[in-house]
Amino acid sequence: MEIKQPDVTVTENLISPEPDDAFIAIPVFIGYTSSLVNKTAIKLNSLADFTRSFTLSFPESGLMYYSVRHFFENGGQQAYVLSLGSDETLNDFPSFITALRQVWITQAISAENDITLIVTPDAIRFNRPDTSYIQRNLWLKFWQSVLNLCKSRRGIMALLDAPDDPELAAKCLAQFSSNDRQWGAVYWPQLNSAYRDQAQNPIVLSPTAAVAAVIQRNDNQRGVWTAPANIALAKVISPVHSYIEANALFNPDGASLNLVRSFPGKGIRIWGCRTLENTPGSLWRYIQIRRLVSYIEAHMTQLGRAFIFEPNNAITWMKFKGQAYNWLRQLWLNGGLRGTQEDQAFELLLGVGESMSEADIRAGKMIMKIKLAVLIPAEFIELSLTFDTRTTR
């Protein structure tokens, strides 16, 4: 709106800080490279970016190189790499786990707001025919160490590898106890890739790099709320193990991993979309549900930050609620929320007596409550977002 006065022109524009709806699941590859880049996550938009940053000699032959290559050749568009050191410094599984626990790694991840997935392809280096308690304990420590990295910021998930031995993998699933299960998904088995070593043998890769690309592509093409499953992988000759060996690993009721299996005439496909969560009836057992809710939470938080500079009153609440409503309604129309009617899909609460008390307002809190039907119409989960308006004054 333009207001004209003698010698003065005032133009008022409505600034609507809408979040970027082109949500992309952006992974960070954490592991060992030919060269070390000190304590910084390097952003990649192509395989060429990787070779410029990490390659000392040609042709490149490191496991991280082939994992990143597999990511881009499966349709990945953007990723980060966080180098723990040169390949020569990786000694054994315990040292890898110790490296993942360094404080600077958490700091490097939290510094990049668009990272939402963690991939650690070097874990497959430590597969042993040993099914002892010691080996099992190392894998459980590895899983928890990566899940701890997911706490660097809300909304980050880990794509995890499992032991190559089916018996050991089943024991790990049965004995893994953690409060962070919903933030991890395990994929099995390893893959014989189409890439060749100097002896012309297939290079064995973790499935997680290709899975990260599939999730990223699925978000763009179908939406974050759709299951990243039954999707073919490129540059794969075969899984290292047949799905027939995995009877104890794919569990419809308890903790489960996700298989990569071969279908005659249909290629090598991801078969499953489960997190490690094993609570019966929990919505967090499904990757797409966990990521959808994180997606909504992130967008609503970003939207709400624009209003913490405003007075904590009914006018501000109306503006915030209006923009949040429009975004959620569009998400529902796109198929992201369940229900044939709007009130079956979501509900927004913001105001005194709805989401806040007078005491909350005096304390400088602006609280929005969001009810979401993410699986069944009119069966809601509730998010509560609290913004501290006092810190801005």
What are these language model-derived features?
Residues 85-99:
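Aromatic/His-enriched, Gly/Pro-containing loop or helix-boundary segments
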Residues 128:
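Glycine/Thr-rich phosphate-binding loops of Rossmann-like dinucleotide-binding domains
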Residues 1-88, 110-124, 148-393:
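Structured, hydrophobic secondary-structure cores that serve as assembly/anchoring elements
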Residues 103-109:
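Short, T/G/N/S-enriched strand-turn elements that build extracellular solenoid repeat scaffolds
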Residues 64, 96-103, 131-146:
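Well-ordered, non-membrane alpha-helical segments in soluble/globular domains
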